[in-house]
Amino acid sequence: MLHLFAGLDLHTGLLLLLALAFVLFYEAINGFHDTANAVATVIYTRAMRSQLAVVMAAVFNFLGVLLGGLSVAYAIVHMLPTDLLLNMGSSHGLAMVFSMLLAAIIWNLGTWYFGLPASSSHTLIGAIIGIGLTNALMTGTSVVDALNIPKVLSIFGSLIVSPIVGLVFAGGLIFLLRRYWSGTKKRARIHLTPAEREKKDGKKKPPFWTRIALILSAIGVAFSHGANDGQKGIGLVMLVLIGVAPAGFVVNMNATGYEITRTRDAINNVEAYFEQHPALLKQATGADQLVPAPEAGATQPAEFHCHPSNTINALNRLKGMLTTDVESYDKLSLDQRSQMRRIMLCVSDTIDKVVKMPGVSADDQRLLKKLKSDMLSTIEYAPVWIIMAVALALGIGTMIGWRRVATTIGEKIGKKGMTYAQGMSAQMTAAVSIGLASYTGMPVSTTHVLSSSVAGTMVVDGGGLQRKTVTSILMAWVFTLPAAVLLSGGLYWLSLQFL
């Protein structure tokens, strides 16, 4: 690992350490800000002692990051303006990363201090949008192009739909439990609050199987949170490393010969597909004429311009770099590796446009998505030590400051105390929906899903909601996005004044 940092001068080394500290601090805040959601219900239903619950959440957050894959990590990264992603080594790219992280840290710390379960995901996405808008305004480019609108809309869709799903499904579970699981005295215990059970049965803990279900569902929430939110931290660390130390991280320097061959085969197959469907490529790119591949033996200009009409030419360049004798990326110069990354990201954007075309069959869509995944496999990666560092930061953060937000979730959303059935329904809904989102690569808000699930159970159970708390949570939800947009955009503009 350390050899990848060899050759960095003092200034670059310090910049790298500072940037990594920023990302890991952001992830630690995410731990004590969002993971309160995983422990709130088990603590307030007395299924686990608070210290044990927090350690459990930290451990399963850690495992969630380690085992969760990278689909969400790069879904977030690709929301950034393409021109900044293609030029991550520039001072503008670094200013972007620092502004984005600082904005997210300021807002997350503020909402945590006041005990508001605001969304770290919303904050990060708002910060990314702020960067995109400021970059578009300063460079005079189209806001629509700068913001990667299709990606932004799909992520917004998941963030808006996920709390509604939480509300409806958790409420539905409570309805079913009330209808079919309250006929006998033994079954009806699941609908008691801890205080009611102590008064009625003289016992402080939930019934055995109810307690097991509460603990398992809390483990599910913690694991799902690590798999979804932890990946966002991994994506940010990779952005930093590509920007500050591109020589070691612009592509996966540890890629095996097999992985490089897989990338090369994908490039050949993408080119073959586009050569067979030139009309589709023209339609997707909006170009009257595609730039053809150069004649054999002709020299190509050194500078590559990313434009969809250049796709065939771009694929030809990639083939020229990744010849069959390249079994390790060490054989390519830094310039070649950087250009290879730029071209692959450019081709990837074109593939995304073609996949969305109405004339593309479902089989072709699957084929193109698979080829895109194979092509990007050696640039969309994360070393194990990065995954471990993010997992540790998230786990440590969980154990530090969980109490403020957990109190809001456990005590202040409903007018009455939380019953065992409500806690279990909210957690099961959150664990399943966040887990599915991580599997499909959609970033969702753990906070929104669990808060809305708790609210759904309270409404269906007839307990009602505390207006003051719900208003505060809704205000935090509404203002998180514009606040993050303004903060990151302002910080980015300010930082560029000094470059």
Swiss-Prot record:
Q: Does the keyword Plastid apply?
A: no
How does the protein's chain sit in the membrane according to the entry? Answer: Multi-pass membrane protein
From the Swiss-Prot or TrEMBL record, state where the protein is found: Cell inner membrane
What does the UniProt keyword field contain?
A: Cell inner membrane, Cell membrane, Ion transport, Magnesium, Membrane, Phosphate transport, Symport, Transmembrane, Transmembrane helix, Transport, Zinc, Zinc transport
Q: Which InterPro entries match?
A: Phos_trans_PitA_PitB, Phos_transporter
Give the principal location in a single coarse category.
Answer: membrane
Any known activators or inhibitors?
A: Phosphate uptake is dependent on the presence of divalent cations, which form soluble metal phosphate (MeHP04) complexes. In Mg(2+)-limiting conditions, the PhoQP-regulated small protein MgtS and sRNA MgrR both regulate the PitA transporter, leading to increased intracellular Mg(2+). Metal phosphate uptake is inhibited at low internal pH. Inhibited by the uncoupler carbonyl cyanide m-chlorophenylhydrazone (CCCP). Is also inhibited by the energy uncoupler 2,4-dinitrophenol and the sulfhydryl reagent N-ethylmaleimide.
- Which superkingdom does the taxonomy of this entry point to? Bacteria
Record's catalysed reaction(s): phosphate(in) + H(+)(in) = phosphate(out) + H(+)(out); arsenate(in) + H(+)(in) = arsenate(out) + H(+)(out)
What does a knockout show?
A: Disruption of the gene confers increased resistance to Zn(2+), associated with reduced accumulation of Zn(2+) when cells are exposed to concentrations of ZnSO(4) below the minimal inhibitory concentration (MIC). Mutant is approximately four-fold more tolerant to tellurite, and cell viability remains almost unchanged during prolonged exposure to the toxicant as compared with wild type.
* Cytoplasmic compartment segments: 26-51, 115-123, 176-206, 254-381, 451-472
Pfam short name (any one):
PHO4
Which example biological process does GO assign this protein?
arsenate ion transmembrane transport
Expression induction per the record is: Expression is not constitutive, as initially thought, but regulated in response to levels of zinc and phosphate in the medium. Expression is repressed by the PhoQP-regulated MgrR sRNA.
Q: What binding partners and quaternary form does the record give?
A: Interacts with the small protein MgtS, and this interaction contributes to an increase in intracellular Mg(2+) content.
Q: What else is known?
A: The Pit system in E.coli K12 consists of two transporters, PitA and PitB, which can transport phosphate independently of each other. Both proteins may have contributed to the kinetic values and substrate specificities determined in earlier studies.
The record's section on PANTHER family has: LOW-AFFINITY INORGANIC PHOSPHATE TRANSPORTER PITA-RELATED, PHOSPHATE TRANSPORTER
Tell me the NCBIfam families matching this sequence. Answer: phos_trans_PitA (NF033774)
Per the record, the similarity remark reads: Belongs to the inorganic phosphate transporter (PiT) (TC 2.A.20) family. Pit subfamily.
Q: What's the name of the protein?
A: Low-affinity inorganic phosphate transporter PitA
Identify the gene encoding this protein: pitA
